[in-house]
Amino acid sequence: MSWLAALLSLLLWAAPAWAIQPLDPSAAVVEVLQMPVSTAQRQCWLEAEASQWEPWLKQQAGYRGRDLLWAPERQQAVVLVGWQSQQQWDAIPASSIGPTEEAFNAQLRDCLGVSDQQPLPLQRAGALKPLQP
C-alpha cells in the first residue's frame, strides 16, 4: 500500500508541470530564457509558469511548446520556448507581454513572500535555431 501513497504523492506534486505543452522538435526557432531559481523557489516558479505564462503562450500564433529545465547544482532555470517562425515570435506586441509578466511576478511575490518587483530576474534571453540534419 505504501507504493500507492508514493505514486499519489508524486502525481500530486508533479501535476502542475503536466499543464505545460512540451517543446515541439520541429520548432524553427527556440527562445532561451535563463534565471536564478533556488531550491526554495522552484515550486513557486513552476506553478507561476504553468498558471501565468502557459495560457498566454497557447494563445500566441506560432507557439510550439516549451521545456522548463532546472540545474540544482547551479540553482538556475532555463526556459526553452519553441516558435514556428521568427516572424511569428517577433509579431507579438510588447504591450501584450507586460500584463502576463506582471501577473507572473505577482504570483511569485505572493508565493515566495517577497516584495521584489521581479523576484526571479532574467539573466539571459536570446534565440537558437535548431541544426538541420
What is each model feature region?
Residues 51-64, 82-120, 131:
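An amphipathic, aromatic/His-enriched active-site/gating alpha helix that lines ligand/cofactor pockets
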Residues 36-49:
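Short, surface-exposed ligand-recognition loops at beta-strand->loop->(often short) alpha-helix junctions
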